[in-house]
Amino acid sequence: MMHTRLSAGRSLWIVLSVCSLVVRPCTNLRGEEPAVPVALAPVTLAPFDVDATPPVGSAMAYGPAVKAADLQLRCRGIVLSGAGEPIVLCAIDWIGVGNAAHDAFREGLAKAAGTTPARVAVHALHQHDAPHADFTAEKLLAGMGVKDHPRFDGDFHREVIARAAAAIEEALPKAKPVTHAGFGRAEVAQIASNRRLIGPDGKFVAWRGSAVKDVTIKGWPEGTIDPDLAALVFFSGDEAIASITSYATHPMSYYRTGVPGPDFPGIARFLRSQDVPTAVHLHFTGAGGNIAAGKYNDASPSNRVVLATRLAAAMRGAFAAATQNKKPITPASIGWGSVPVVLAARDGLELEKLAEEVRGKPDRGTFAPIDALAFATRAREAHAIDVTCLTVGGTRMLHLPGELFVEYQLAARQMRPDLDVFMAAYGDYGPGYIGTAAAYGQGGYEVLPTSSFVGPEAEGPLLDAIGTLLEVSK
């Protein structure tokens, strides 16, 4: 099967064509801060896992929960200790955690783990029958006197942060030594396809979302995707204790049901937990802002299981490859990098005008004027978003914000083909969609000012941060 691996803007092509590669480990970076000394104690891993399902009546992205969930939403992760200050990775089955809520999540988990927020990565998987946390939006709404907002339920969101923090504190004394780690990839069959259909003139022609019944739109090629699922597996002796996977696609088969659910990635993750019950299975959504299952999904309930089975098969294959490739781990094998990036609000996002829209228009779900206002407010304050990188031997796991286009993930892989590079996106959800510079001139839903709160200028700082973390020579 042929896949278009990269369809990027001019600046992305320049980055890929001129970067020269060096082979050295990713150090601990945050601006000009010195590297954290590597400890001599053994590396340990503590998993945590809590319920993140909203109760009936609680706010979700597209209306309140009207029925109890059949399969819970989870907030789970790991704490790696023994290589400098602890490192925390967390994935939550919510549509997004943005702005001040993302800060609060990182701060809460950092305090529990005895580390700094700069060494904590929190990502949503982006399922749509799920909550949306944004404490900046919540504060702005309160200041404007807007009550009973249908989307933001900060009390519940803070409760989940507290649950996760308590789970970390409970897990740390039970941490297991990490003796080995391995990385593997497996191609995912018939899930991902590019949402943006581009014509011969380079302009947007049609949109192919998460579920499509139009045979003409279904018939277009998959387009630019990353067909591979990546897996990083940690072992304690012969026992797998954590499996971290990532795949770039919107994670929905169907939604707006009023029933909280983790959709097909959550089902796949559950299936894998039955295969390997000794490990915490931690799945992330990669740079899937312009990727969905539309070519292979018609929104029929039965197809959710089909997609889950395909994803679980790739998880199984990548796990097997990682097991085959496992290598001994020492504290020197583990590293963490953090580069703060300031993303400007796109031209035309005026705070006063957005505030008027918030007061005058009902909220119709993600995205809405309040989301643009929240990000633009933070951008005016030059708030930095941390782009981070976990090093485990020859593997690099990058952590990026927003609904990032897949071209960034492909570019990162091409920057360091000598390393095993993979990515989690949907970190700080504040920016909304983050397209390539070229995409903003093509048109389409993802780059509208109501969907993407940054402009084409975002590409440069993000690629620079990725290059810095991967230590690509300029």
Regions of interest found by a model, annotated:
Residues 33-279, 284-288, 296-306, 319, ...:
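Conserved beta-alpha junction segments in alpha/beta enzyme cores
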Residues 23-34:
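Signal peptide processing junction and immediate N-terminal pro/mature segment
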Residues 315:
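Glycan-recognition surfaces in beta-rich domains, encompassing non-catalytic CBMs
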Residues 1-9:
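N-terminal secretory signal peptides that target proteins for export/translocation
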